[in-house]
């Protein structure tokens, strides 16, 4: 399969690329930084994202999956200390990049025999704490957009789903804090396994809870 992974230079992206590549798929890693062999694309530039979609189609003829793993977090101790510039940043990272990739890749996913799209969301979207106001609002907006995208895919073989975590953990975090147990966190390798499992289900417009 031909699978695009955005945010591919981050811990979750690296785990997804590693898993999907090991399974024999052609994975196109995309990241703003261009680090670790990824394609350097600014996902806040809609025209650049449209060009990415056109380039993928020209080179591979199709796309079987788009896994959007661009993330970010900003928070505060109290609601009153919330910084609106943090809210704006999170809107850019979590919502605008999502809007651009779904609008650009929708035709390719619809044309695929089994196209899959997914984002990672957080429990904070459904039950935000006061210090997570900006983050929870951005995640909730991203979920709403993804569910609308899922509705647009109804009647086609393609699906769009939301993978829900409390938070993610990776080996670097464990090495930095060997005494922490990270209760309720989802390992990025387990997330990668869940991503690969999307092609084994026809579920569409579903919030898949990885915390249970």
Where are these regions (language model features)?
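Catalytic loop of short-chain dehydrogenase/reductase
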Residues: 90, 110, 116-154, 167
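Active-site loop of short-chain dehydrogenase/reductase
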Residues: 62-64, 109-123, 155-159, 203-206
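Catalytic Tyr-X3-Lys loop
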Residues: 80-100, 117-118, 142
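Rossmann-fold cofactor-recognition segment
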Residues: 32-47
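Conserved mid-core segment of classical short-chain dehydrogenase/reductases
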Residues: 50, 71-88, 131-134
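C-terminal helical subdomain
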Residues: 155-158, 162-163, 170, 179-212
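N-terminal Rossmann NAD(P)H-binding glycine-rich loop of SDR-like oxidoreductase domains
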Residues: 9-18
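Amphipathic alpha-helical dimer-interface segment in Rossmann-like NAD(P)H-dependent oxidoreductases
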Residues: 17, 54-58, 93-113, 150-151
